[in-house]
Amino acid sequence: MGADLREINALSGAEAYEFARMGQALMNAITRFPAPVYAAIEGHCMGGGLDLALSCSYRITGPSAVFGHRGAALGLMTGWGGTQRLPRLVGKANALEMFVAAERITAAEALRIGLVDAIVEDPVGEAVRRIQNVGSPRRH
């Protein structure tokens, strides 16, 4: 999940600003949701998709998932709050490395730096199981 870069490149300055504001409003609504919100991640979680996952209370991933914030390599940065949320979650040094190097990291590395909470074979099933057993404190 993320933005279609062809669409982004076609936006005027005012349209790009509005797109960023709408994305920020959505991510903030997810962050403020009164119950835990789980991101079940499989495949690629990049850019805006990573911003979405960062807005959630918990991130559960499959073993083959790949994460990254490659905007710097593409000459852009998402405006959906990832640049603020990622350092809070993984620390300034790890976030800076992800932003500047713009390299993809594995699920195992994401777990090591605290980007994800668990690696499981069935992220969706695990998220549903955890939601059904809500009672853990919320984390951001």
Named regions from a protein language model:
Residues 21, 81, 105:
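Conserved active-site and cofactor/substrate-binding residues in soluble primary-metabolism enzymes
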Residues 1-27, 45, 73-75:
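Glycine- (often His-adjacent) and acidic-residue-rich active-site loop
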Residues 47, 102-109:
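Acidic, divalent-metal-coordinating active-site segment for phosphoryl/phosphodiester hydrolysis
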Residues 60-65, 107-140:
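C-terminal long alpha-helix characteristic of the crotonase
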Residues 26, 30-32, 40, 46-99, ...:
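CoA-thioester-processing core
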Residues 4, 52-53, 110:
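Hydrophobic/aromatic residues within transmembrane alpha-helices
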